[in-house]
């Protein structure tokens, strides 16, 4: 089957935003105007097509990025048909991993901002992730019909808060309840959408007299931005004082693709205005798969040679599994982004990360949670495969004869954990299966069994994250679970260098055990080193044979899993084996492993050991009246206020760093202090030393035989 849409007419885009900026409604409108969805789904009544998980409909927030394919030929059918793959990403901080995951496979993004709330904390997080993956983007200021809407204020905030370079290509006609349409600065005409057809039809009109000067000023700004794309355009502009429509689009496109500028539009998705022009901008300014840098990977050879795969059907097949979901009808759905080559139903693919070959059952194109079977996928496509058993998020799938491992995704370590147990013994096995599947879908969610207590521990990125996991166990797998109190993932480390002997000697009849080492423990700067532990050796003259170095390292690492101070994992240590002795007969791997473990245990306690706790970046938005109470409460929680911003409508944004241990139950407390009017967001910032008085309580509990983590 030949390719139906040329790859140059593909756009793989993400729609990304802060909670309540109206992102899901915007996506809904895209599906409506591109003809996929007949009745517009509103989040207000819990019926949006993209928010397909039940919890999302209840909570009104988007949790998983559903991928949808649609087609667009322009508001006035001015383009040949383009294929747009839309990935809807969540806007809640606990789900930042989902955003990160979708950024990896996108070619361009559309950032949605609220015309009233503007650039909010989560917007900054998403912006940083888009910078990290160098994703070209445009911005859409939504909710122009709301009281307090101000397009130009959001333009300013993008500059000051995000360090962005926004270039509006439309300006609004009116605002709040007088918002009627936009002035298109490229055409220099007013666009008015037809209410009766829910915005499917529109007409160009004259620019309202009171807007002519504003429009002219912003048009000049836009034309200058386009002219800076090349010397040729700049010369033309300086000679003629203006640029043609084609030149403006070419200049803005070149600079958007280079991430130098962000084209800005506005509208009201809810009122069916503006999304149509934004779709045109996606085609005009965002890249096709052939216009972004070719994906890089590592070949399957001794030297791990770097290689890239061009976005072409002729290149060997390569794809990235960026999301795994469990579907009650077909089982595992693996969402893949195809970077090169063609994959047909029934083909075998190779997974170099797991060194396994698997066969593809069906290939389905998703529209939110409805699916359509297709025969093949080609470079640039995003689709879901059925029947892959051993694939995890972030794995590469490729052609067996041309093996390549694409860059893996990095997932943050969880910061919060809690114990779960099934309400009935009968549910034990069901719970294990459920947790296993959920962990496969979501790499930022981890499950392990506590060795001391035998309890099942689940860990994630925040309270909401774990709430939703427990909720999904109940809904999708029918497992009722009791959950324990949340526990903080503390860490242990050292502050000074020490040298320590470690000796393991056992003498019984016959062959004994003998391992003897001297190890130097040094503090390691985790951030600078890019790792949490390092092992080195400086053994001279073979006093410890080479074959036992690995055993010493292993002994130390095993001891680090459950630290010496309070049983928490140890980080930030460099261990150097520099001396020791051995016995020809009695020395073996186990002896040196034990010697290494003892040296670490004893040395650690002399190296000025400390407990580290996760510190969260917290941002609270509150009406000014409650600011004093909120600040006082953050201080009581050992918070350090970093700064404050004034937001529109007399609201203040308070930025602080607060230990996670002090943040449990914060949402309830904050709501009661502000009569439900304050909101907050929280994300992991760093690990920092726990104050002595707090650490002493945790250590004392551990030494008295209490379990780690049951600190209040």
From Swiss-Prot:
CDD domains: EF-G (cd01886), EFG_III (cd16262), EFG_mtEFG1_IV (cd01434), EFG_mtEFG_C (cd03713), EFG_mtEFG_II (cd04088). GTP binds at residues 17-24, 88-92, 142-145. Residues 8-290 form the tr-type G domain. Keywords: Cytoplasm, Elongation factor, GTP-binding, Nucleotide-binding, Protein biosynthesis. One of its GO terms (cellular component) is cytoplasm. Pfam families: EFG_C, EFG_III, EFG_IV, GTP_EFTU, GTP_EFTU_D2. One of its GO terms (biological process) is ribosome disassembly. GO terms for molecular function: GTP binding; GTPase activity; guanosine tetraphosphate binding; translation elongation factor activity. It is found in: Cytoplasm. Catalyzes the GTP-dependent ribosomal translocation step during translation elongation. During this step, the ribosome changes from the pre-translocational (PRE) to the post-translocational (POST) state as the newly formed A-site-bound peptidyl-tRNA and P-site-bound deacylated tRNA move to the P and E sites, respectively. Catalyzes the coordinated movement of the two tRNA molecules, the mRNA and conformational changes in the ribosome. HAMAP family: EF_G_EF_2_B. Belongs to the TRAFAC class translation factor GTPase superfamily. Classic translation factor GTPase family. EF-G/EF-2 subfamily. This is Elongation factor G.
């Amino acid at each position: 089957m030949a390719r139906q849409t040329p790859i140059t007419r593909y756009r793989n885009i993400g729609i990304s935003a802060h909670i309540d900026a109206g992102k899901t409604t915007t996506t809904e409108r895209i599906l409506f105007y591109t003809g996929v969805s007949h009745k517009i789904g509103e989040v207000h009544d819990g019926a949006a097509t993209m928010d397909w998980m039940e919890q999302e409909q209840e909570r009104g927030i988007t949790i998983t990025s559903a991928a949808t394919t649609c087609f667009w030929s322009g508001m006035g059918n001015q383009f040949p048909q383009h294929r747009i793959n839309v990935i809807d990403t969540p806007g809640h901080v606990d789900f930042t991993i989902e955003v990160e995951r979708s950024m990896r496979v996108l070619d361009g993004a559309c950032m949605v901002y609220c015309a009233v709330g503007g650039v909010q904390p989560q917007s900054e997080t998403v912006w940083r992730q888009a910078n990290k993956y160098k994703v070209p983007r445009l911005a859409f200021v939504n909710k122009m019909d709301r009281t307090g809407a101000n397009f130009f204020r959001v333009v300013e905030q993008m500059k000051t808060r995000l360090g962005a370079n926004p270039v509006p290509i439309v300006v609004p006609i009116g605002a709040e309840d007088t918002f009627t349409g936009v002035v298109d600065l490229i055409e220099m005409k007013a666009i008015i959408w037809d209410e009766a057809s829910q915005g499917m039809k529109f007409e160009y009109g004259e620019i309202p007299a009171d807007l002519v000067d504003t429009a002219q000023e912003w048009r000049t700004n836009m034309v200058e931005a386009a002219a800076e794309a090349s010397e040729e355009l700049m010369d033309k502009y300086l000679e003629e004082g203006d640029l043609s429509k084609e030149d403006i689009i070419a200049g803005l496109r070149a600079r958007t693709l280079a991430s130098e500028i962000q084209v800005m539009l506005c509208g009201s998705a809810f009122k069916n205005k503006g999304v149509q022009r934004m779709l045109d901008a996606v085609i005009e300014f965002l890249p096709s798969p052939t216009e972004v840098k070719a994906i890089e990977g590592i070949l399957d050879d001794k030297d791990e040679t770097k290689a890239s795969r061009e976005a072409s059907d002729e290149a060997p097949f390569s794809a990235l599994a960026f999301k795994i979901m469990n579907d009650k009808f077909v089982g595992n759905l693996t969402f893949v982004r195809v970077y090169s080559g063609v994959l047909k139903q029934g083909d075998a693919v190779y997974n170099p990360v797991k060194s396994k070959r698997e066969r593809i059952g069906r290939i389905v194109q998703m529209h939110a949670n409805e699916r359509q079977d297709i025969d093949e996928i080609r470079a640039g496509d995003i689709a879901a495969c059925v029947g892959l058993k051993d694939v995890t998020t972030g794995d590469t799938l490729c052609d067996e004869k041309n093996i390549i491992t694409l860059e893996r995704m990095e997932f943050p370590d969880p910061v919060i954990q809690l114990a779960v147990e099934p309400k009935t013994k009968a549910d034990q096995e069901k719970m294990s299966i459920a947790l296993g599947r959920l962990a496969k879908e979501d790499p930022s969610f981890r499950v392990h069994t506590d060795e001391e207590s035998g309890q099942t521990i689940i860990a994630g990125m925040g309270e909401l994250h774990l709430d939703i996991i427990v909720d999904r166990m109940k809904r999708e797998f029918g497992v009722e679970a009791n959950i324990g109190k949340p526990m903080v993932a503390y860490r242990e480390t050292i502050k000074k260098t020490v040298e320590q002997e470690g000796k393991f000697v056992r003498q019984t009849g016959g062959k004994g055990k003998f391992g003897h080492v001297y190890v130097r423990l040094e503090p390691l700067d985790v951030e600078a080193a890019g790792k949490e532990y390092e092992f080195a050796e400086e053994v001279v003259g073979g006093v410890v044979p080479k074959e036992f170095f690995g055993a010493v390292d292993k002994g130390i690492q095993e001891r680090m899993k459950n630290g010496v101070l309070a049983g928490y994992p140890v980080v930030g240590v460099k261990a150097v084996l520099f001396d020791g002795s051995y016995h020809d007969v009695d020395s073996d791997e186990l002896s040196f492993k034990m010697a290494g473990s003892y040296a670490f245990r004893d040395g650690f306690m002399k190296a000025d050991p400390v407990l580290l706790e996760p510190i969260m970046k917290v941002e609270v938005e509150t009406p000014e009246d409650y600011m004093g109470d909120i600040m006082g409460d953050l201080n009581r929680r050992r918070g350090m206020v970093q700064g404050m911003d004034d937001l529109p409508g007399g609201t203040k944004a308070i930025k602080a760093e607060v230990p996670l241990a002090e943040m449990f139950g914060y949402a309830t407390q904050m709501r009661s202090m502000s009569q439900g009017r304050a909101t907050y967001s929280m994300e992991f910032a760093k690990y920092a030393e726990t104050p002595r008085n707090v650490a002493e309580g945790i250590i004392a509990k551990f030494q008295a035989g209490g379990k780690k983590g049951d600190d209040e």
